[in-house]
Amino acid sequence: MELENYEQPVVLREDNLRRRRRMKPRSAAGSLSSMELIPIEFVLPTSQRISKTPETALLHVAGHGNVEQMKAQVWLRALETSVAAEFYHRLGPDQFLLLYQKKGQWYEIYDRYQVVQTLDCLHYWKLMHKSPGQIHVVQRHVPSEETLAFQKQLTSLIGYDVTDISNVHDDELEFTRRRLVTPRMAEVAGRDAKLYAMHPWVTSKPLPDYLSKKIANNCIFIVIHRGTTSQTIKVSADDTPGTILQSFFTKMAKKKSLMNISESQSEQDFVLRVCGRDEYLVGETPLKNFQWVRQCLKNGDEIHLVLDTPPDPALDEVRKEEWPLVDDCTGVTGYHEQLTIHGKDHESVFTVSLWDCDRKFRVKIRGIDIPVLPRNTDLTVFVEANIQHGQQVLCQRRTSPKPFAEEVLWNVWLEFGIKIKDLPKGALLNLQIYCCKTPSLSSKASAETPGSESKGKAQLLYYVNLLLIDHRFLLRHGDYVLHMWQISGKAEEQGSFNADKLTSATNPDKENSMSISILLDNYCHPIALPKHRPTPDPEGDRVRAEMPNQLRKQLEAIIATDPLNPLTAEDKELLWHFRYESLKHPKAYPKLFSSVKWGQQEIVAKTYQLLARREIWDQSALDVGLTMQLLDCNFSDENVRAIAVQKLESLEDDDVLHYLLQLVQAVKFEPYHDSALARFLLKRGLRNKRIGHFLFWFLRSEIAQSRHYQQRFAVILEAYLRGCGTAMLQDFTQQVHVIEMLQKVTIDIKSLSAEKYDVSSQVISQLKQKLESLQNSNLPESFRVPYDPGLKAGTLVIEKCKVMASKKKPLWLEFKCADPTVLSNETIGIIFKHGDDLRQDMLILQILRIMESIWETESLDLCLLPYGCISTGDKIGMIEIVKDATTIAQIQQSTVGNTGAFKDEVLNHWLKEKCPIEEKFQAAVERFVYSCAGYCVATFVLGIGDRHNDNIMISETGNLFHIDFGHILGNYKSFLGINKERVPFVLTPDFLFVMGSSGKKTSPHFQKFQDVCVRAYLALRHHTNLLIILFSMMLMTGMPQLTSKEDIEYIRDALTVGKSEEDAKKYFLDQIEVCRDKGWTVQFNWFLHLVLGIKQGEKHSA
């Protein structure tokens, strides 16, 4: 594309220069003067001839200059004075690092554009009364073969090469890699090596009443194993593992030989581990607070522990860092007083404050270039340019329409209605290409508002974003050719559009993508966004004192609304005017910060004054839903997001796991790669292996599926992998290797059976051959199960493996348990899927776990069974096979064939067969009642559809559970244009029969079912906002069933927001009656499901 030459750069007017020369320099209180010359001693890489000591150069460096200029000054001095001047002629400054020492650590002065007076070393030297400070000039080292091999291993684990900078228009990726070294090293240095090696899974939440009742006299029996011997001991639920070991060794003092314990060994040499699992009970936590113990109590299982030697912490050794540290001042600019041009001679100006730039922001749209034109060439195109902050569009302009061709040139300046000084950090220049059949727009560049009618029926084709203020706080300038993202026609990809359109990454497919050429104003000097200095807000007390009663009530009503309730312009004005009153109510924070006009620098400054006075927020109890709201796509300001992350610091590990899925998604809404949230995830992953395990898979899955955020997730994952330790790296390598091999087998098997549902004997034979070949060659001896890191799978049990009768041909795989201390011969069953996106199933299963935790606070155990499920790549994943469970369809068919769907007594008879002892049968019925109630409430609130007898299962102990969550939030399936879902949830006559109820007759079990349903439903209503927020944060992940706020409205309606408790109770009881009245319609659907020949196999979540 031929582009015209750019006009002369913007220059400062002579009268302004003269005026500034007359003004005296000013300095910020307590900071270096912007005009100050700073003495620094530089230790050079060359040595003196006689003494052989390093040469030094004492320079007086301008505080307002940048690091690059300081480096050039050093080079000039070295060229003039060094005895090895030829060395400095031969090598340039870019081949050297600037290092300084702080508290025994070497730090690199990394950012070449950083203003000298903002360097951390200056503040450190001042604190230490050291003048002049010393900076070492050190030659960059060439990476060793070992380093390159390690980076190659990391690239394989990440699934993306973070060293490839071919698709970046700045150095943010490398900049972030370096910035994350410091928090990583701090976390690794501070973690307890022994606890990290054993990663106990604990909680500090009180034991629910229903579990307390299962502990008689606060005592628990545990079985301790050693070799082939075991010993049962009685302990207190409040005992710590250390106390239990001490008691056990006292009891076994004369019987050590029976347990294969030498006389010299004591309790100090052992730890307690769960039999068959990599799950340790260590630390000062009471026994009742270990999650595994609670799980055993809940399921009525015995607690079996093995007396084991602790793992060697050396196995978690972290590879030594080859990079010097960079401090947190890297990339930070000075205050406005330091950067301002006012009071400086123009020869002394090196960096200019953004707040001095009073002109309006503009961009020159040069043109677009597309490799292949669309089929319909009778089109016109135009460019729409928005400046936006989060979801808030600050201003908009667009070009005139022109005929669509391979090359379209405009060469037109678009001037925005926002001044450069008002551009907030995180502001995006959003460029979008629209096309329409007829030129419905004015031929001149216009300034329409978003959504204006003049856009007519224009269709969005391409988009790309550019951060206007980069990761160094510097205003972008000059030429850019940006490769754009195409709007996908695939429904599953359209769901992620709202998140994707926030990315600042460009399309890596440069050869086949649309490119747009733009020009931003050039300047004589870098333009830097200054740091905000906290100052008092004179309006604060006056505004607070003036609030009338009526407006106070109005404000409280706005604050009380749920997150889906849109704020009117009047609401926003009221919230902002009475911002200091709003500050008293933590629930107001998301609404208050949504009311900020981020395109006005004065307003932003006042917002930071508010944030400085957030004592009530800091002291308030953690409300996860509220805090997560501040991390959604509506907030781009790093300070607002930082107070949310700060609040999350108090989350215990188990809760971090609960919300990890959303927290990883929230990283997409950060404007920059390095953020408080990214550091929080990194820190918690490095602190706890269980969190680290899931963080690895959640990030890796996103890297594989989200091209728009590959770089961001990759740089966080690399930072984690560099600090997780050798043992974790080996585990991940094994897991990735297994998945890659199984993926290849699945693809081969699918190619043999095409898209058919049935599975031929030839296909089964081929599978067994391929698995045997795998077992004999490349399959690791053991690997950690991705959805359950406590389990290690061993060799395949090939005779039990099969191809499932489903369109995508998932593999039913069974492995031996690799842990020799496992007590049973049960295999580890895994369904390996290729071709389905499991992220929606993961979300529903995660929400079910959160519902469980909500119900636990009400002392309700609804026996949910959120089985293991994890996405491990692009439409690849694993699902846990629940043991001793079968589908309702199989039970019905095995008895009387397809008509079993109409036989009310079939399920009850099957349960009696499995539990022939009356006591066990009654316990199974009780479990059935509670689990049925739990899934009725959960599936109703989440709008889970397409419920049939092949995706509802039951265990041999009466635990009902649902699988396959392809239709959620009321997006129900239809058959021949008719909605199949005629009931709010599944409560069929055969379910009622198990409860002793039929027709309209009641029973004690049915009454209990109703009571439990109502309690569970009302408990969820108290957490409506949390559920709404969790789904809102997943809106932009690409799930076809979760694409708009209208989808989430379903939850609000299902939970009857706005109704009284009594009305809500009546509403849910009415839903139960609807199910009883129309249960026959469900049975008829189930009958059709069987008759139409939909294959069952041993289908589970397939």
Curated annotation (Swiss-Prot):
Residues 943-951 are annotated as: Catalytic loop. Phosphorylated at Thr-1024 by PKA. Phosphorylation inhibits lipid kinase activity. Autophosphorylation at Ser-1101 has no effect on the phosphatidylinositol-4,5-bisphosphate 3-kinase activity. Residues 962-988 are annotated as: Activation loop. Residues 541-723 form the PIK helical domain. It catalyses: a 1,2-diacyl-sn-glycero-3-phospho-(1D-myo-inositol) + ATP = a 1,2-diacyl-sn-glycero-3-phospho-(1D-myo-inositol-3-phosphate) + ADP + H(+); a 1,2-diacyl-sn-glycero-3-phospho-(1D-myo-inositol-4,5-bisphosphate) + ATP = a 1,2-diacyl-sn-glycero-3-phospho-(1D-myo-inositol-3,4,5-trisphosphate) + ADP + H(+); a 1,2-diacyl-sn-glycero-3-phospho-(1D-myo-inositol 4-phosphate) + ATP = a 1,2-diacyl-sn-glycero-3-phospho-(1D-myo-inositol-3,4-bisphosphate) + ADP + H(+); L-seryl-[protein] + ATP = O-phospho-L-seryl-[protein] + ADP + H(+). The modification Phosphothreonine is found at residue 1024. Phosphoinositide-3-kinase (PI3K) that phosphorylates PtdIns(4,5)P2 (Phosphatidylinositol 4,5-bisphosphate) to generate phosphatidylinositol 3,4,5-trisphosphate (PIP3). PIP3 plays a key role by recruiting PH domain-containing proteins to the membrane, including AKT1 and PDPK1, activating signaling cascades involved in cell growth, survival, proliferation, motility and morphology. Links G-protein coupled receptor activation to PIP3 production. Involved in immune, inflammatory and allergic responses. Modulates leukocyte chemotaxis to inflammatory sites and in response to chemoattractant agents. Belongs to the PI3/PI4-kinase family. This is Phosphatidylinositol 4,5-bisphosphate 3-kinase catalytic subunit gamma isoform. The gene is Pik3cg.
